[in-house]
Protein backbone atom coordinates (compact mmCIF):
# COMPACT_ATOMS: atom_id res chain seq x y z
CA UNK A 1 0.00 0.00 0.00
CA UNK A 2 3.04 2.27 -0.10
CA UNK A 3 3.75 2.15 -3.81
CA UNK A 4 3.49 5.93 -4.13
CA UNK A 5 6.02 6.54 -1.38
CA UNK A 6 9.36 7.91 -2.61
CA UNK A 7 12.75 7.82 -0.87
CA UNK A 8 13.18 9.26 2.61
CA UNK A 9 15.48 9.60 5.54
CA UNK A 10 15.83 7.22 8.47
CA UNK A 11 12.99 7.35 10.97
CA UNK A 12 15.20 8.10 13.94
CA UNK A 13 16.94 10.99 12.22
CA UNK A 14 15.81 14.60 12.34
CA UNK A 15 13.29 15.43 9.65
CA UNK A 16 15.43 18.50 8.81
CA UNK A 17 15.37 22.08 9.85
CA UNK A 18 12.13 22.70 7.96
CA UNK A 19 10.09 20.75 10.46
CA UNK A 20 12.10 21.52 13.58
CA UNK A 21 11.28 23.99 16.37
CA UNK A 22 13.80 26.72 15.34
CA UNK A 23 11.66 27.66 12.36
CA UNK A 24 8.71 28.24 14.68
CA UNK A 25 10.41 31.06 16.57
CA UNK A 26 7.48 33.45 16.08
CA UNK A 27 4.93 31.09 17.58
CA UNK A 28 3.26 32.27 20.77
CA UNK A 29 2.13 29.91 23.55
CA UNK A 30 -1.42 30.04 22.19
CA UNK A 31 -0.29 28.89 18.76
CA UNK A 32 0.84 25.47 19.93
CA UNK A 33 -2.62 24.59 21.18
CA UNK A 34 -4.56 22.16 19.06
CA UNK A 35 -7.42 24.61 18.51
CA UNK A 36 -5.36 27.35 16.93
CA UNK A 37 -2.68 25.25 15.24
CA UNK A 38 -4.87 22.51 13.79
CA UNK A 39 -8.63 22.59 14.32
CA UNK A 40 -9.30 26.18 13.29
CA UNK A 41 -7.18 26.05 10.11
CA UNK A 42 -8.86 22.78 9.16
CA UNK A 43 -12.32 24.18 9.82
CA UNK A 44 -11.52 27.31 7.81
CA UNK A 45 -10.47 25.17 4.86
CA UNK A 46 -13.38 22.75 5.10
CA UNK A 47 -16.02 25.41 5.64
CA UNK A 48 -14.77 27.37 2.61
CA UNK A 49 -14.84 24.25 0.45
CA UNK A 50 -18.25 23.34 1.86
CA UNK A 51 -19.63 26.76 0.96
CA UNK A 52 -18.39 26.40 -2.62
CA UNK A 53 -19.81 22.89 -2.77
CA UNK A 54 -23.14 24.07 -1.37
CA UNK A 55 -23.41 26.73 -4.07
CA UNK A 56 -22.68 24.13 -6.76
CA UNK A 57 -25.08 21.63 -5.19
CA UNK A 58 -27.87 24.19 -5.03
CA UNK A 59 -27.29 25.19 -8.65
CA UNK A 60 -27.39 21.57 -9.85
CA UNK A 61 -29.91 20.27 -7.29
CA UNK A 62 -27.44 17.54 -6.32
CA UNK A 63 -26.88 17.18 -2.57
CA UNK A 64 -24.47 14.34 -3.29
CA UNK A 65 -21.78 16.84 -4.29
CA UNK A 66 -20.96 17.03 -0.60
CA UNK A 67 -19.95 13.37 -0.83
CA UNK A 68 -17.44 14.29 -3.52
CA UNK A 69 -15.94 16.77 -1.06
CA UNK A 70 -15.61 14.29 1.81
CA UNK A 71 -12.50 12.38 0.61
CA UNK A 72 -11.01 15.05 -1.64
CA UNK A 73 -11.01 17.71 1.09
CA UNK A 74 -9.22 15.38 3.49
CA UNK A 75 -6.47 14.69 0.95
CA UNK A 76 -6.14 18.40 0.22
CA UNK A 77 -5.93 19.25 3.92
CA UNK A 78 -3.30 16.59 4.61
CA UNK A 79 -1.04 17.73 1.78
CA UNK A 80 -1.56 21.41 2.48
CA UNK A 81 -0.68 20.95 6.14
CA UNK A 82 2.35 18.76 5.49
CA UNK A 83 3.73 20.37 2.33
CA UNK A 84 1.85 23.53 1.40
CA UNK A 85 2.30 25.37 4.68
CA UNK A 86 6.10 24.86 4.88
CA UNK A 87 6.37 25.96 1.24
CA UNK A 88 4.47 29.21 1.83
CA UNK A 89 6.01 29.98 5.23
CA UNK A 90 9.63 29.40 4.24
CA UNK A 91 9.60 30.00 0.49
CA UNK A 92 10.87 26.52 -0.33
CA UNK A 93 10.15 24.11 -3.14
CA UNK A 94 7.81 21.13 -3.07
CA UNK A 95 10.74 18.74 -3.21
CA UNK A 96 12.50 20.40 -0.29
CA UNK A 97 9.37 20.36 1.86
CA UNK A 98 8.70 16.72 1.03
CA UNK A 99 12.30 15.69 1.65
CA UNK A 100 12.05 17.19 5.14
CA UNK A 101 9.46 14.60 6.18
CA UNK A 102 10.63 11.45 7.96
CA UNK A 103 9.65 8.09 6.50
CA UNK A 104 6.59 7.41 8.66
CA UNK A 105 5.07 10.80 7.88
CA UNK A 106 5.55 10.08 4.18
CA UNK A 107 3.79 6.77 4.65
CA UNK A 108 0.94 8.55 6.44
CA UNK A 109 0.66 11.19 3.72
CA UNK A 110 0.73 8.55 0.99
CA UNK A 111 -1.93 6.43 2.70
CA UNK A 112 -4.27 9.42 2.99
CA UNK A 113 -3.74 10.20 -0.70
CA UNK A 114 -4.27 6.59 -1.83
CA UNK A 115 -7.43 6.17 0.21
CA UNK A 116 -8.95 9.55 -0.63
CA UNK A 117 -8.18 9.43 -4.34
CA UNK A 118 -9.76 6.01 -4.80
CA UNK A 119 -12.86 6.95 -2.82
CA UNK A 120 -13.29 10.23 -4.70
CA UNK A 121 -12.96 8.46 -8.05
CA UNK A 122 -15.51 5.86 -6.98
CA UNK A 123 -18.04 8.44 -5.78
CA UNK A 124 -17.63 10.59 -8.89
CA UNK A 125 -17.95 7.61 -11.25
CA UNK A 126 -21.05 6.36 -9.47
CA UNK A 127 -22.58 9.83 -9.59
CA UNK A 128 -21.97 10.27 -13.32
CA UNK A 129 -23.24 6.76 -14.06
CA UNK A 130 -26.44 7.31 -12.08
CA UNK A 131 -27.17 10.66 -13.71
CA UNK A 132 -29.25 11.90 -10.79
CA UNK A 133 -28.93 12.64 -7.08
CA UNK A 134 -28.34 9.87 -4.56
CA UNK A 135 -31.61 8.27 -3.45
CA UNK A 136 -30.78 9.08 0.17
CA UNK A 137 -31.15 12.79 -0.56
CA UNK A 138 -34.24 12.82 -2.77
CA UNK A 139 -36.64 12.73 0.19
CA UNK A 140 -34.97 15.52 2.18
CA UNK A 141 -34.96 17.81 -0.85
CA UNK A 142 -38.76 17.71 -0.84
CA UNK A 143 -38.85 19.54 2.48
CA UNK A 144 -40.06 23.17 2.11
CA UNK A 145 -37.14 25.58 1.88
CA UNK A 146 -34.59 22.78 1.99
CA UNK A 147 -31.83 24.59 0.12
CA UNK A 148 -32.18 27.77 2.19
CA UNK A 149 -31.09 25.99 5.33
CA UNK A 150 -29.03 23.17 3.84
CA UNK A 151 -25.69 24.87 4.36
CA UNK A 152 -26.16 25.37 8.10
CA UNK A 153 -27.92 22.04 8.68
CA UNK A 154 -25.85 19.71 6.49
CA UNK A 155 -22.78 21.18 4.79
CA UNK A 156 -21.29 23.24 7.64
CA UNK A 157 -21.75 20.54 10.34
CA UNK A 158 -19.93 18.05 8.12
CA UNK A 159 -17.08 20.55 7.80
CA UNK A 160 -16.84 20.62 11.60
CA UNK A 161 -16.84 16.82 11.78
CA UNK A 162 -14.13 16.64 9.12
CA UNK A 163 -11.98 19.01 11.18
CA UNK A 164 -11.94 16.50 14.03
CA UNK A 165 -11.58 13.44 11.80
CA UNK A 166 -8.51 15.02 10.20
CA UNK A 167 -6.58 15.31 13.47
CA UNK A 168 -4.74 12.04 12.83
CA UNK A 169 -3.12 13.45 9.68
CA UNK A 170 -2.83 17.14 10.55
CA UNK A 171 -1.55 17.12 14.13
CA UNK A 172 1.69 15.28 13.18
CA UNK A 173 2.61 18.15 10.87
CA UNK A 174 1.60 21.06 13.11
CA UNK A 175 2.51 20.05 16.67
CA UNK A 176 6.04 18.98 17.61
CA UNK A 177 5.27 17.76 21.10
CA UNK A 178 4.29 14.16 21.72
CA UNK A 179 5.06 10.87 23.38
CA UNK A 180 7.95 8.90 21.89
CA UNK A 181 8.25 5.13 21.84
CA UNK A 182 11.45 3.12 21.76
CA UNK A 183 13.27 2.74 18.46
CA UNK A 184 13.00 -1.02 18.74
CA UNK A 185 9.20 -0.95 18.43
CA UNK A 186 8.84 1.80 15.82
CA UNK A 187 9.08 -0.63 12.91
CA UNK A 188 6.60 -3.00 14.54
CA UNK A 189 4.03 -0.26 15.12
CA UNK A 190 4.45 1.08 11.61
CA UNK A 191 4.05 -2.42 10.14
CA UNK A 192 0.88 -2.92 12.19
CA UNK A 193 -0.50 0.40 10.97
CA UNK A 194 0.28 -0.36 7.33
CA UNK A 195 -1.29 -3.80 7.73
CA UNK A 196 -4.49 -2.29 9.13
CA UNK A 197 -4.52 0.27 6.32
CA UNK A 198 -4.01 -2.42 3.69
CA UNK A 199 -6.83 -4.52 5.10
CA UNK A 200 -9.21 -1.58 5.43
CA UNK A 201 -8.40 -0.19 2.00
CA UNK A 202 -8.88 -3.61 0.39
CA UNK A 203 -12.15 -4.21 2.23
CA UNK A 204 -13.59 -0.86 1.16
CA UNK A 205 -12.44 -1.30 -2.45
CA UNK A 206 -13.72 -4.89 -2.64
CA UNK A 207 -17.09 -3.85 -1.23
CA UNK A 208 -17.51 -1.10 -3.83
CA UNK A 209 -16.39 -3.33 -6.70
CA UNK A 210 -18.53 -6.32 -5.72
CA UNK A 211 -21.60 -4.15 -5.22
CA UNK A 212 -21.14 -2.53 -8.64
CA UNK A 213 -20.75 -5.91 -10.36
CA UNK A 214 -23.77 -7.31 -8.52
CA UNK A 215 -25.99 -4.42 -9.62
CA UNK A 216 -25.03 -5.02 -13.25
CA UNK A 217 -26.40 -8.57 -13.09
CA UNK A 218 -29.14 -8.60 -10.45
CA UNK A 219 -31.62 -6.33 -8.69
CA UNK A 220 -31.73 -8.00 -5.27
CA UNK A 221 -29.48 -7.25 -2.30
CA UNK A 222 -25.78 -8.01 -2.58
CA UNK A 223 -25.05 -10.50 0.20
CA UNK A 224 -22.05 -12.37 -1.14
CA UNK A 225 -18.30 -11.75 -1.06
CA UNK A 226 -17.27 -9.27 1.61
CA UNK A 227 -20.95 -8.34 1.88
CA UNK A 228 -21.36 -11.73 3.52
CA UNK A 229 -19.17 -10.61 6.42
CA UNK A 230 -21.21 -7.61 7.60
CA UNK A 231 -24.01 -5.51 6.14
CA UNK A 232 -21.74 -2.50 5.62
CA UNK A 233 -18.21 -3.71 4.79
CA UNK A 234 -17.40 -0.43 3.04
CA UNK A 235 -17.90 1.53 6.25
CA UNK A 236 -15.91 -1.02 8.24
CA UNK A 237 -13.06 -0.68 5.74
CA UNK A 238 -13.19 3.09 6.03
CA UNK A 239 -13.02 2.81 9.82
CA UNK A 240 -9.95 0.57 9.66
CA UNK A 241 -8.24 3.03 7.32
CA UNK A 242 -8.71 5.90 9.78
CA UNK A 243 -7.55 3.72 12.67
CA UNK A 244 -4.37 3.07 10.69
CA UNK A 245 -3.75 6.81 10.43
CA UNK A 246 -3.74 7.10 14.22
CA UNK A 247 -1.52 4.02 14.54
CA UNK A 248 1.01 5.52 12.14
CA UNK A 249 1.28 8.46 14.52
CA UNK A 250 2.47 6.07 17.20
CA UNK A 251 5.51 5.20 15.09
CA UNK A 252 6.80 8.72 15.70
CA UNK A 253 6.26 11.41 18.34
CA UNK A 254 2.70 10.51 19.33
CA UNK A 255 0.17 13.08 20.47
CA UNK A 256 -2.80 11.24 22.05
CA UNK A 257 -5.23 13.80 20.64
CA UNK A 258 -4.97 12.12 17.22
CA UNK A 259 -7.13 9.30 18.57
CA UNK A 260 -10.08 11.67 18.30
CA UNK A 261 -9.80 11.38 14.52
CA UNK A 262 -10.80 7.72 14.07
CA UNK A 263 -13.23 7.97 16.99
CA UNK A 264 -15.08 10.86 15.32
CA UNK A 265 -15.05 9.03 11.99
CA UNK A 266 -16.48 5.89 13.61
CA UNK A 267 -19.23 7.77 15.42
CA UNK A 268 -20.17 9.61 12.24
CA UNK A 269 -20.36 6.40 10.19
CA UNK A 270 -22.31 4.51 12.83
CA UNK A 271 -24.78 7.07 14.06
CA UNK A 272 -25.00 9.98 11.61
CA UNK A 273 -24.10 9.62 7.96
CA UNK A 274 -23.17 5.96 7.57
CA UNK A 275 -24.96 2.67 8.11
CA UNK A 276 -27.79 4.17 10.18
CA UNK A 277 -28.71 6.68 7.46
CA UNK A 278 -28.25 4.13 4.67
CA UNK A 279 -30.43 1.44 6.21
CA UNK A 280 -33.14 3.88 7.25
CA UNK A 281 -33.35 5.04 3.66
CA UNK A 282 -33.28 1.46 2.35
CA UNK A 283 -36.08 0.35 4.64
CA UNK A 284 -38.28 3.27 3.62
CA UNK A 285 -37.71 2.78 -0.11
CA UNK A 286 -37.85 -1.01 -0.21
CA UNK A 287 -40.96 -1.20 1.95
CA UNK A 288 -42.93 0.95 -0.50
CA UNK A 289 -41.25 0.07 -3.79
CA UNK A 290 -39.75 -3.43 -3.54
CA UNK A 291 -41.33 -5.80 -0.97
CA UNK A 292 -39.04 -8.67 -1.99
CA UNK A 293 -35.92 -6.59 -1.38
CA UNK A 294 -37.40 -5.35 1.88
CA UNK A 295 -37.86 -8.95 3.02
CA UNK A 296 -34.25 -9.72 2.12
CA UNK A 297 -33.07 -6.72 4.11
CA UNK A 298 -35.06 -7.74 7.19
CA UNK A 299 -33.68 -11.27 7.00
CA UNK A 300 -30.15 -9.96 6.48
CA UNK A 301 -30.48 -7.76 9.55
CA UNK A 302 -31.18 -10.87 11.61
CA UNK A 303 -28.38 -12.95 10.10
CA UNK A 304 -25.50 -10.45 9.90
CA UNK A 305 -24.12 -7.70 12.08
CA UNK A 306 -24.28 -4.20 10.71
CA UNK A 307 -20.68 -3.13 11.24
CA UNK A 308 -18.45 -5.54 13.14
CA UNK A 309 -18.19 -9.18 11.97
CA UNK A 310 -19.17 -12.01 14.28
CA UNK A 311 -16.60 -14.56 15.43
CA UNK A 312 -17.66 -17.13 12.84
CA UNK A 313 -17.23 -14.54 10.08
CA UNK A 314 -13.57 -14.05 10.98
CA UNK A 315 -12.73 -17.41 9.39
CA UNK A 316 -14.72 -16.62 6.27
CA UNK A 317 -12.46 -16.91 3.16
CA UNK A 318 -13.19 -13.30 2.34
CA UNK A 319 -12.07 -12.19 5.79
CA UNK A 320 -8.84 -14.10 5.28
CA UNK A 321 -8.42 -12.48 1.86
CA UNK A 322 -8.78 -9.04 3.42
CA UNK A 323 -6.21 -9.93 6.08
CA UNK A 324 -3.92 -11.18 3.33
CA UNK A 325 -4.14 -7.81 1.60
CA UNK A 326 -3.01 -6.19 4.82
CA UNK A 327 0.02 -8.49 4.92
CA UNK A 328 0.83 -7.68 1.30
CA UNK A 329 0.71 -3.98 2.17
CA UNK A 330 3.26 -4.52 4.94
CA UNK A 331 5.58 -6.39 2.57
CA UNK A 332 5.35 -3.63 -0.05
CA UNK A 333 5.96 -0.83 2.46
CA UNK A 334 8.89 -2.68 4.04
CA UNK A 335 10.38 -3.31 0.62
CA UNK A 336 10.24 0.37 -0.27
CA UNK A 337 11.64 1.37 3.11
CA UNK A 338 14.57 -1.02 2.88
CA UNK A 339 15.29 0.14 -0.66
CA UNK A 340 15.00 3.90 -0.26
CA UNK A 341 15.27 4.65 3.45
CA UNK A 342 18.63 3.10 4.23
Which residues fall in each region the model found?
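Hydrophobic transmembrane alpha-helices
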Residues: 2-50, 55, 74-117, 165-210, ...
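Juxtamembrane helix-capping/reentrant segments at transmembrane boundaries
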Residues: 62-78, 92-101, 132-153, 220-227
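Eukaryotic endomembrane system proteins
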Residues: 130-189, 198
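Glycine-/proline-rich flexible loop or hinge segments
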Residues: 53-63
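Juxtamembrane interfacial secondary-structure elements that flank transmembrane helices
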Residues: 64-65, 86-90, 117-135, 274-278
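Residue-level signal for the start and early helices of compact helical domains
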Residues: 56-57, 128-131, 148, 202, ...
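A basic- and aromatic-enriched beta-loop-alpha substructure that forms the phosphate/nucleotide-
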Residues: 100-142
Amino acid sequence: MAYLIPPSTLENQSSSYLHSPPLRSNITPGDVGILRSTLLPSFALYSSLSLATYIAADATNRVELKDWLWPSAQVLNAWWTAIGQPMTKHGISFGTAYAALPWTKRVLLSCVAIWGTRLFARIAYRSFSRGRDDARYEAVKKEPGFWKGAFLRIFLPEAAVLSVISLSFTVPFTMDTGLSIGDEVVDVVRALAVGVFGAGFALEAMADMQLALHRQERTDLCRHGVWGLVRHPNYLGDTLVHVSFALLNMAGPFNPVVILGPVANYLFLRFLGGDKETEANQEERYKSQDPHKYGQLRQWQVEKNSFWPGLRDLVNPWALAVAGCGFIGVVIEEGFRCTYDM
